């Protein structure tokens, strides 16, 4: 059961750096992989691989808890979250914990509880990881057949896939329950500048939910990233949760069809490559979502989006010059277009100047000033509220720009604040991780396909320089 086939047949190109070093008896001779290849040594040791995965989960959860507490310890309630370099507290605030009207933090205790719960969970996972890595059975197939598997067993693999899908569906429903029953979530569109509210009228219409998927990714369409009310977001999670759970049950109860058996490679490395591809797609979508969407990622916590900061600047100076007596409806700019207001390609009244390229921005502080044909001149003259002025001035000076040395803001802007927006960090990190995961997908997919075809192109190791060097030890 342990070794259906020799791994060395599939991986003939691995060369040992240090022939005498073995880790816990899992050496290159028995696994086909040297110590530095990490979990590849555990491909056929399901018990030890379980330990590695549980320990890894423990490290992830430990980071979450420790970083959470670190952010709580450094948090200053008087400053906006996005000015403090926080990347975890904005997520907790978005879920409606500890915040009130306008996104003001009124209680940090829920954040503390979150950190402690994650630390406790990480201890449990850490213990489980150490137990399965060092003490538990090497393989699960004999003693716990339900948890055992053989990579080539297609039926078992789709059952495991089904279990994962059900867990993902439950995760989607956790957000739904939080929004519907457990205190609600933060809605940046709530009247007067955002507030926590329970979502009562969830969007379940398939034409709306799946219509997002059919939108163009460009311009004013924006694919799923254009979603701009919480009813749609929570409704989308209801649909995703149902689809994941039903799909999970389907995969548990059925065996792969003949076309799938032929089309896919059925090996551990192939499954790794599929997973990396999926995570890569998630990373790229998350990058765009964080960068452009100010509903799922409220600007009160993450800072304004790029278009939002730009439009806020135009709005701020419109307010200033209007007070100084400018006629903002007819003033001409240096290009001959409107200085403060102009028309979009489709006829709406929009902000003039360089920010015209961001004319399709939608933001809670700006929408009340729109009429049926874009920005409403009479509202701009009579209806601008102090909170809209304050927020736009704040967003104008906190554009999500930054450089590698963490000197943020617009380089030429005398009013800018030296900071780096968490929006920049989250967007950039997810893009970079998405890219590397995609490269990993290509790498492992290529190896898995080569192994399945019975050959593997590798470097010819006969004359490799390392072979003539003295061993490390």
UniProtKB/Swiss-Prot annotation:
It comes from the Eukaryota. Keywords: Acetylation, Chlorophyll, Chloroplast, Chromophore, Manganese, Membrane, Metal-binding, Phosphoprotein, Photosynthesis, Photosystem II, Plastid, Thylakoid, Transmembrane, Transmembrane helix. The chain crosses the membrane at residues 69-93, 134-155, 178-200, 255-275, 291-312, 447-471. [CaMn4O5] cluster binds at residue 367. Gene3D superfamilies: photosystem ii from thermosynechococcus elongatus. Residues 1-14, 426-473 form a propeptide. Binds multiple chlorophylls and provides some of the ligands for the Ca-4Mn-5O cluster of the oxygen-evolving complex. It may also provide a ligand for a Cl- that is required for oxygen evolution. PSII binds additional chlorophylls, carotenoids and specific lipids. It is a multi-pass membrane protein. GO terms for molecular function: chlorophyll binding; electron transporter, transferring electrons within the cyclic electron transport pathway of photosynthesis activity; metal ion binding. Pfam families: PSII. Its main location: plastid. It is found in: Plastid, Chloroplast thylakoid membrane. Over time a tryptophan in the fifth lumenal loop is converted to 2-hydroxy-2,3-dihydrotryptophan, 2-oxo-2,3-dihydrotryptophan, and kynurenine by oxidizing species from the active site. This oxidation targets the protein for turnover. PSII is composed of 1 copy each of membrane proteins PsbA, PsbB, PsbC, PsbD, PsbE, PsbF, PsbH, PsbI, PsbJ, PsbK, PsbL, PsbM, PsbT, PsbX, PsbY, PsbZ, Psb30/Ycf12, at least 3 peripheral proteins of the oxygen-evolving complex and a large number of cofactors. It forms dimeric complexes. Belongs to the PsbB/PsbC family. PsbC subfamily. One of the components of the core complex of photosystem II (PSII). It binds chlorophyll and helps catalyze the primary light-induced photochemical processes of PSII. PSII is a light-driven water:plastoquinone oxidoreductase, using light energy to abstract electrons from H(2)O, generating O(2) and a proton gradient subsequently used for ATP formation. This is Photosystem II CP43 reaction center protein.
């Amino acid at each position: 059961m342990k070794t259906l086939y020799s791994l060395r047949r599939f991986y003939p190109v691995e060369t040992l750096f240090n022939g005498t070093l073995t880790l816990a008896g899992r050496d290159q001779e028995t696994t086909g992989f040297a110590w530095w290849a990490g979990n590849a040594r555990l491909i056929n040791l399901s018990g030890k691989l379980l330990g590695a995965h549980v320990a890894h989960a423990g490290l992830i959860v430990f980071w979450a808890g420790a970083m959470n507490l670190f952010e709580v310890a450094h948090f200053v309630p008087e400053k906006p979250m996005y000015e403090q370099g926080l990347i975890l507290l904005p997520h907790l605030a978005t879920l409606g914990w500890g915040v009130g009207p306008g996104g003001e933090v009124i209680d940090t205790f829920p954040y503390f509880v979150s950190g402690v719960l994650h630390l406790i969970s990480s201890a449990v996972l850490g213990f489980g990881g150490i137990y399965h890595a060092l003490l538990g059975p090497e393989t699960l197939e004999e003693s716990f057949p339900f948890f055992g598997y053989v990579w080539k067993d297609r039926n078992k693999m789709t059952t495991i896939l089904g279990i994962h899908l059900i867990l993902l569906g439950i995760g989607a429903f956790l957000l739904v329950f939080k929004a519907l029953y457990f205190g609600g979530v933060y809605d940046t569109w709530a009247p007067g500048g955002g507030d926590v509210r329970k979502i009562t009228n969830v969007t379940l219409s398939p034409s709306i939910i799946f219509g997002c998927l059919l939108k163009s990714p460009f311009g004013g369409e924006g694919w799923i990233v254009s979603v701009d009310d919480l009813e749609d977001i929570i409704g989308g999670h209801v649909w995703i949760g149902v689809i994941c759970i039903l799909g999970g049950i389907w995969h548990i109860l059925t065996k792969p069809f003949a076309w799938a058996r032929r089309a896919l490679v059925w090996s551990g490395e192939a499954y790794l490559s599929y997973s990396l591809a999926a995570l890569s797609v998630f990373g790229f979508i998350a990058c765009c979502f964080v960068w452009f969407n100010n509903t799922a990622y409220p600007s009160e916590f993450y800072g304004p989006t790029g278009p939002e900061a730009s439009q806020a600047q135009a709005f701020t100076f419109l307010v200033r010059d209007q007070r100084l007596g400018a006629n903002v409806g007819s003033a001409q700019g240096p290009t001959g277009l409107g200085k403060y207001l102009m028309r979009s390609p489709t006829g709406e009244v929009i902000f003039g100047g360089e920010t015209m390229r961001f004319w399709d921005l939608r933001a809670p502080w700006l929408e009340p000033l729109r009429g049926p044909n874009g920005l409403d001149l009479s509202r701009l003259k009579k209806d601008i509220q102090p909170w809209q002025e304050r927020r736009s001035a704040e967003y104008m000076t906190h554009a999500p720009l930054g450089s590698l040395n963490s000197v943020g803001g617009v380089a030429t802007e005398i009013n800018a604040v030296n900071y780096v927006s968490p929006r920049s960090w989250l967007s950039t990190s997810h893009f970079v991780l998405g890219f590397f995961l995609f490269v990993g997908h290509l790498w492992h997919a290529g190896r898995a396909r080569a192994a399945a075809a019975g050959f593997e192109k590798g470097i010819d190791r006969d004359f490799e320089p390392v072979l003539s060097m003295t061993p490390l030890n």
